[in-house]
């Protein structure tokens, strides 16, 4: 299975840099068996049935991009350097792993100041990543980070414009509650309160799970034989309550539909050992590509993904490679907007 099998031509202008307003007005491509329909996210009301269960990732994106100043005394007097930091994940010892640019301009033991309230000491460097120990913790840290940090927009958006205050709302789901992600579960960005209310009134049910999306989600696949690719690991949790709700839906013969690839990867991770959904917590590096046997997901709502990405491989596993090629060719022809701030698809195998 070759990397080129998952490539396609995407015009640059179809990469969205801002989301649709309101959220649920984004376009929705529905692929069911051999049919393709074009509509809006609000049309989910026509495609979902009473008893269907949407699985939603409730992770909260942290404003993980920080710009700091390093101060140092030299023979010529005080000197400073600007260091850009992208926080990656908290460590067991209370420090944070992060990407520091340029790393060569700061030494272990030196301090970065991000604002009057927030600073951090570089305590170690591991595999090219800095380990930062902040001066604050808990709610005080969260508040200072919210003030000093910017949203960690994906590289293909950040290359076109800097993050701004609007992104702190736009790049967050309306139900986000468990902080820890450095990328959003972007299919979920299409939901607003009116749509959730309308779906609930129709009899669609919701289950919340948590997968803290990491920066590794944007890493390119560098091997030609995709089956040898090593996935990054991300922390996730399916609570006993969530597992019971999903199991009950399956037992009743109704559909379980994850919203986003993160929710899908998590619930399939939770079913890997027994074949059925069970409570689960830990690091998952599940890699889903054609040939994968889905045990929980009956369909998937997801955005349109990058060529040659692991997420293109995932949707190809669900729908079949030829089918996905046709779906994506249709999306390009009809000028759907792609990637994190783009439009959505509902894939029903």
From Swiss-Prot:
Family the UniProt entry places it in: Belongs to the QueA family.
Localization terms from the record: Cytoplasm
Parts of the chain that traverse the membrane: none
UniProtKB keywords: Cytoplasm, Queuosine biosynthesis, S-adenosyl-L-methionine, Transferase
Pathway where this protein functions: tRNA modification; tRNA-queuosine biosynthesis
Coiled coil: none
Gene Ontology CC, one term: cytoplasm
EC id: 2.4.99.17
Protein's name in the database: S-adenosylmethionine:tRNA ribosyltransferase-isomerase
Gene3D superfamilies given in the database record: QueA-like
Reactions performed catalytically: 7-aminomethyl-7-carbaguanosine(34) in tRNA + S-adenosyl-L-methionine = epoxyqueuosine(34) in tRNA + adenine + L-methionine + 2 H(+)
Alphabetical list of Pfam families matching this protein: Queuosine_synth
Subunit structure: Monomer.
BP GO terms, sorted: queuosine biosynthetic process; tRNA wobble guanine modification
SUPFAM superfamilies from the UniProt entry: QueA-like
Main location: cytoplasm
One Gene Ontology term of the molecular function aspect: S-adenosylmethionine:tRNA ribosyltransferase-isomerase activity
Protein task: Transfers and isomerizes the ribose moiety from AdoMet to the 7-aminomethyl group of 7-deazaguanine (preQ1-tRNA) to give epoxyqueuosine (oQ-tRNA).
PANTHER family the record matches: S-ADENOSYLMETHIONINE:TRNA RIBOSYLTRANSFERASE-ISOMERASE
């Amino acid at each position: 299975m070759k990397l080129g099998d998952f490539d396609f031509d995407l015009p640059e202008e179809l990469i969205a840099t801002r989301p649709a307003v309101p959220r649920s007005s984004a376009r929705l491509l529905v692929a069911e068996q051999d049919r393709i329909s074009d509509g809006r996210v609000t049309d989910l009301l026509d495609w979902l049935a009473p008893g269907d269960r949407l699985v939603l990732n409730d992770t909260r994106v942290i404003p993980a991009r920080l710009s700091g100043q390093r101060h140092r005394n030299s023979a010529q007097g005080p000197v400073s350097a600007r260091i850009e930091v992208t926080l990656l994940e908290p460590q067991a010892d209370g420090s944070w792993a992060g990407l520091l640019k340029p790393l060569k301009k700061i030494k272990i033991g030196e301090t970065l100041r991000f604002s009057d309230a927030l600073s951090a000491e570089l305590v170690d460097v591991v595999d090219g990543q800095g380990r930062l120990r902040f001066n604050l913790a808990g709610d005080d840290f969260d508040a200072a980070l919210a003030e000093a940090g910017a949203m960690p927009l994906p590289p293909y958006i950040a290359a076109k414009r800097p993050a701004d205050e609007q992104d702190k709302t736009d790049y967050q789901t309306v139900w986000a509650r468990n902080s820890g992600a450095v990328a959003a579960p972007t299919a979920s960005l299409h939901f607003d309160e009116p749509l959730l209310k309308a779906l609930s009134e129709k009899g669609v049910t919701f289950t919340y799970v948590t997968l803290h999306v990491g920066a590794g989600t944007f890493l390119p696949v560098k091997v030609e034989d995709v089956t040898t690719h090593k996935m990054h690991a991300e922390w996730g949790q399916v609570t006993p309550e969530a597992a019971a709700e999903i199991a009950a839906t399956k037992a009743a013969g109704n559909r379980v539909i994850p919203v986003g690839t993160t929710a899908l990867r998590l619930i399939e991770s939770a079913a890997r050992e027994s074949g059925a959904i069970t409570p689960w917590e830990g690091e998952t590096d599940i890699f889903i590509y054609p040939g994968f046997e889905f045990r929980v997901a009956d369909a998937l709502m997801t955005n349109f993904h990058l060529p040659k990405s692991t997420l293109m491989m995932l949707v190809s596993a669900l729908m079949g490679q030829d089918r996905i090629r046709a779906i994506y060719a249709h999306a390009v022809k009809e000028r759907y907007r792609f990637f994190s701030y783009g439009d959505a698809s509902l894939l029903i195998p």
